[in-house]
Design a protein with these regions (language model features):
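Short, solvent-exposed aromatic-acidic interface loops
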Residues: 97-102
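Extracellular/lumenal ectodomain signal focusing on beta-strand-rich modules
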Residues: 29, 57-60, 96
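Surface-exposed, charged secondary-structure patches
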Residues: 42-90
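Terminal "cap-and-tail" regions of soluble proteins that handle hydrophobic small molecules
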Residues: 5-6, 12-13, 93-95
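Generic helix N-cap/helix-start motif at coil->alpha-helix transitions
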Residues: 1-3
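Short, solvent-exposed secondary-structure junction/capping segments
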Residues: 8-14, 23-39
């Protein structure tokens, strides 16, 4: 089980294909980056996760559960090893995540 409850909820939402739960764990102004470039969160998640059957298999976690190594797969790109880093706001919701291939 993942240590950080917000990160755990986000991973569960991704793996369930639950867009509503995914956005529910984010702050309204959440941001993200992919391979070092800021992206439009809504467009990116629609394309890479919810429109493509995205799935996260966790290899490891660090930084109190806010940094993950993940085997991420989707119908567009197949499977790749990725790093994910999360910033969690005081209200317990994710305000930013960064991902990229390792």
């Amino acid at each position: 089980m993942l240590t950080d409850p917000a990160v755990r909820a986000l991973v569960a939402a991704v793996n369930a294909g639950d867009r509503e739960a995914f956005h529910g764990v984010l702050t309204p102004d959440a941001t993200m980056s992919d391979d070092g470039s800021d992206r439009d969160l809504q467009q990116w998640t629609d394309r890479e996760i919810f429109g493509a059957g995205g799935h996260m298999d966790i290899e490891s976690e660090s930084e109190d559960g806010r940094s993950l190594i993940v085997r991420f797969r989707n119908d567009t790109w197949g499977e790749m090893r990725t790093a994910w880093r999360f910033e969690v706001a005081e209200n317990g919701r994710i305000s930013r995540f960064e991902t990229g291939q390792t």
